[in-house]
Swiss-Prot record:
This is Adenine phosphoribosyltransferase. Its main location: cytoplasm. It holds the Pfam family Pribosyltran. Keywords: Acetylation, Cytoplasm, Glycosyltransferase, Phosphoprotein, Purine salvage, Transferase. It comes from Mus musculus.
Amino acid sequence: MSEPELKLVARRIRSFPDFPIPGVLFRDISPLLKDPDSFRASIRLLASHLKSTHSGKIDYIAGLDSRGFLFGPSLAQELGVGCVLIRKQGKLPGPTVSASYSLEYGKAELEIQKDALEPGQRVVIVDDLLATGGTMFAACDLLHQLRAEVVECVSLVELTSLKGRERLGPIPFFSLLQYD
């Protein structure tokens, strides 16, 4: 992994205490999105990891609603694969599959269209941040319901003190930046 690129990405993440509720330290990626060099570096770093780990054996990137949508299509394009969307409840037309999950600060439900993937297709799930792992775990559940293979979950930021990685069990997880 390129240390200069990683530092470029890290400098563009800022913190807001007590947002959206007291006791939560929000990691804001907005400065990263404003800076094309930093954003490109984040995509290159994630793609480099996935290329070296999976040797081109990825069929799709699944972007999580909503900030995973910012990285999913660019990462998919960099890897030369398709991108599918995992949305919050009620946002997708047609038949869907759903799974409930807990956030760091609430509860919600995710959905994916039933025809989004074929059984056996190899998928990487991407989001901006891993906290408790609830969203990623629900996304894995959705893809397993479609009989797709989740080969890895990735995010820009990981909040290690919340142990979200452990919630994913045997599914590999990778993050560019780790914060306590």
